Amino acid sequence: MAALLLTSMVWSGHAQEKNEMDLSGEWAFQTDVMDFRRGSLDVRYCHRLQESIVLPRITDDYKIGYKSPYRHLDRLTRVYEYMGPAWYQREIEIPAAWKGKRIFLYFERTHWLSSVYVGKEEVSKIDYISIPHNHELTQWLHPGKKELITFCIDNRYQYDTHKWDHAHSEFTQINWNGVLGEIKLVAVDPVYVDDMQVYPDIKNKSIKVKMTVRNCTEHTASGKISFHVTGKDYRLQKEVPVTVTDSITYIEEEMFLGKDIHLWNEFHPNLYTLDCKLTSSVDGQSYAHEKSTTFGMREVEAGEDHIILNGEPIHLRGTVENAVFPKTGYAPVDDASWERVLRILKEYGMNHMRFHSWCPPAAAFRMADKLGVYLEVEMPMWGKDAQPDEKRWNFFRRELRGILKEYGNHPSFILYCNGNEITGDFSFIEELTATARQLDNRRLYSGSTARTRVKSDQFYITHQTTKGHMGIYEGRPYTNWDKNKELGVGLPIISHESGQRCIYPNFEEMKNFTGPVQARNFEIFRELLDKNHMLDQAHDFFRASGALTAIEYKDVIEAQLRTYLKGGFQLLSLNDFTGQGYAPVGILDPFWNTKGLITPEKWREFCAPTVALLRFDKRALYNDEVFEGKAEIYNYGPALLKNAKINWRITDSNGKTLKSGKLKTQTVGKNGVFPLGSFSYALDNITEPQKLTVHLSVAHVKNSWDIWVYPRHSNLMQSTSEVLYTTVFDEKAKQHLADGKKVVLCPKPSKVKGRKSVFHNHFWNPIMFKWPPMTIGCLIHDDQPIFEHFITSYHTDWQWWDILENAKVIEMKDAPVALRPFIQVIDHYDNNEKLGIGFEAKVKKGSLLVLAVDTQKNINERPATQQLLESIDRYVKSDKFAPQITVDESYIESFLKK
């Protein structure tokens, strides 16, 4: 345990302000893994603590706890694990000027139960997870004297909640112990504003201020409340008299802001500040208290299909924030960290963030307010948490009210959901949702994501409606599709956890895990790859699988945008998810740094407030066909596109324009998806295989799509005296090889023992979801002469669709180490077996090429497969086909069914 020995620790009370005392700094400290101190007033357990720690921090920062020897496969490994009570202590001199005031001990963020002792007496305990802990200590503190304040933070599970809740799971942010953010004593006069909520009314250009005033004097207090509203080039003052007769008095005041109010939204995140000063007197004694909050003039309603903000439909383009913070192990509480994350979010054209089964600290709300990001917030609730358990239910009831009170004024807080994929007693979920709607109508509410709807739902995050499956997790080899027929169910539907296509881990990231968690699972993955003699290909696997995931995201997002009846989508996620099996599904790493797979500028071509869209039926065509495109525009930007010029063009791989045209200049509406017109291009002038790019620009926005054009081929796979084409490895093929000739073996996929072949890379991650075939794309050895007449990159793209969907993956663990397939399928990182669809080898005196692709099924409708076979034919009939790696006949027979 790294800790300093304390000689004396007395805090004299250097307050930042006269009514606040900053308590950050050194505290006496002691762990209590056996829980000896809890609830005991025995003198043995009330001694001065002998170690020290500096707050705000967490125990992991000081290497406190059990040093883990493990290498967790399914998550990052916490280096120093501590779960249990930890004690913090300081002697503090309470200012004499605080006599007669109410005194609170404030922790901005802690985890999970905090208990406070003054001297030997336990005086307060709080178990919120989502909001600050504010302990009133008035009764036990004596201004002008030194007091020994001890508090205990217990990060054990206080209730039987789901172990994956992102608020306290080791799978995301760690289950830390400590205090973060502000730690302070606060003194207020006995008549003070306990709560102040601002309710905007944009129709009447006014606000309603709802206040809770506490009077602890036991006498009537009379005075006034002074309101001061400021904004951009705006000031308003108002005073109202007030009489506080009871211990709690509720006050409402309406304020007209004027004719020219500034609304808050993603494009114009205008903010106002309300400063309130309560001055009062009781029996000649004067009191004063000030409270401030920011707010935005915005109203949220549930439309038929979309969320309505300030009277206009919006469309959410979001990601899920899963509390992944490997640098610190906890969610940051400072503005700069959240501003960075949310600016990156907006840089990628997104306007929305869902906090999956957790609620962020105030800094996240402040920065979302500032930058114009729509937030959906949840409690730490998941799975079985709705099953009957009154203690747990009461915790959720308190947590809900706390979240609404603490963060309710933030205009970015437009959506609330109880939690993730909840099961159990949905009458309890309905109770929570109905209660929230009754308490605070400033946002929309939903019972749960992706499970059963409840009566009070105002929106629903799901992949399934009563009309069918409307989730979108991968693209298709065409773009003329959407999910509109599965929608139109009477309330806004947001697509649940879209995307989730796995990328091979980038082992270069391992050096970045310098905080309380380490990527020791990467060590296991790397060792497996090394054991299978492919470590030199690790970065190629990352690049190839990552390129495919980026391609998938473009198609997933464009399909979401074409689905005009959908209220929005949430990716899972823009950055990697480090738990539940480790899911590297993001185009950003866990630290929100780029992986180098796609630039923000390119991403914004298909994910932005305004996006040009194109519907077409094929990505791979013959040159006797006509490409036909139907242009659309997704426009949820701030304005109409007046007199928008619409241009299209088709270019070859060198950027040369082959054909261009214009569609009708028109004014495009906003808050919807609008058809623009059609165009076509006859491909008969394309005589050689080509990759073409279709470009579409609408006013200032542009987008593009790749297509592949091939000539038709007949008489494919024709054997000669030197080259034998066959689907079976029979005696004829063996003799051909023994004679020093060439054989091309294309076994039917049903005759290969290996895995299913698919275009898409694995969903989510292979450790949690062990769904076959457990592959994550292909590495194409495009520099080899076999691809001289087949256009490809090092990764698969849409021209590979019909090839891969009609193939079989050969498991090649018994192949010679040096043998690398030219179509190399990337195995999941928890296995790292060598896999292939096509390879070549020397067998006896001959040369063998194996291609585990169905070369007969609907071959006239498969232009890319035809072209691959043509390229192979030219290759094997040339001198370039000269395999150097030798395999036995028995190896070939080992992966073929008899």
Predicted features along the sequence, with ranges:
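Aromatic-rich peripheral "rim/lid" segments of glycoside hydrolase catalytic domains that contact
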Residues: L439, L572-G637
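Beta-strand-rich binding/interaction modules
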Residues: V116-V118, S206-T243, I251, V626-T665, ...
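Substrate-binding/catalytic cleft of secreted carbohydrate-active enzymes
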Residues: L342-R343, H352-L588
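Extended acidic/polar, glycine-enriched regions
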Residues: H142-K146, R214-E301, S678, N685-L716
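Extended carbohydrate-recognition surfaces in non-catalytic/accessory domains of CAZymes
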Residues: Q16-Y106, H162-T172, W176-V179, T578, ...
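Catalytic beta-strand/loop cores that center a nucleophilic Ser/Cys/Thr
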Residues: L439, P749-K753, N765-P863, K880-K898
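Accessory beta-strand-rich segments of carbohydrate-active enzymes
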Residues: Q30-M34, R78-V79, M83-V193, C216, ...
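Active-site-adjacent substrate/metal-binding segments within catalytic domains
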Residues: Y62-I94, W98-V118, S124-D127, P190-Q197, ...
